[in-house]
C-alpha cells in the first residue's frame, strides 16, 4: 500500500513539474527579449503582403504611399500591416 501511495504521489509531482515547465516554455516563446509591448506584436503574412502590394501600386513618384485601410484591427504603416 505504501508503494502505491508513493507511486501516485511521484506521478502527481512529475505531472505538476512537467505542466509548470511547459507553461514557462510557452511564456518564454511568446515574449521577445528587448521588444516593448507597443512595438509590432504580430504580423499576419497575408495582410502584410496585401498591404505592401497595395501601397506599391498606389505610390506615385515622390508622393508618400496612400494608406490602405487594413481590416480587423490592422493598419498600414511603413508599407506593412501592423496590429493596432
From Swiss-Prot:
GO terms for molecular function: toxin activity. Disulfide bonds join 51-65, 55-76, 70-81. Pfam families: Toxin_20. Expressed by the venom gland. InterPro entries: Hwtx-2-like (IPR012625). It comes from the Eukaryota. GO terms for cellular component: extracellular region; host cell postsynaptic membrane. The keyword Disulfide bond applies. Its main location: secreted. It is found in: Secreted. The keyword NADP does not apply. Residues 23-48 form a propeptide. Residues 1-22 form the signal peptide. Keywords: Disulfide bond, Neurotoxin, Postsynaptic neurotoxin, Secreted, Signal, Toxin. Belongs to the neurotoxin 12 (Hwtx-2) family. 02 (Hwtx-2) subfamily. Blocks neuromuscular transmission. Acts cooperatively to potentiate the activity of huwentoxin-I. Paralyzes locusts and kills mice following intracerebroventricular injection. This is U1-theraphotoxin-Hs1a.
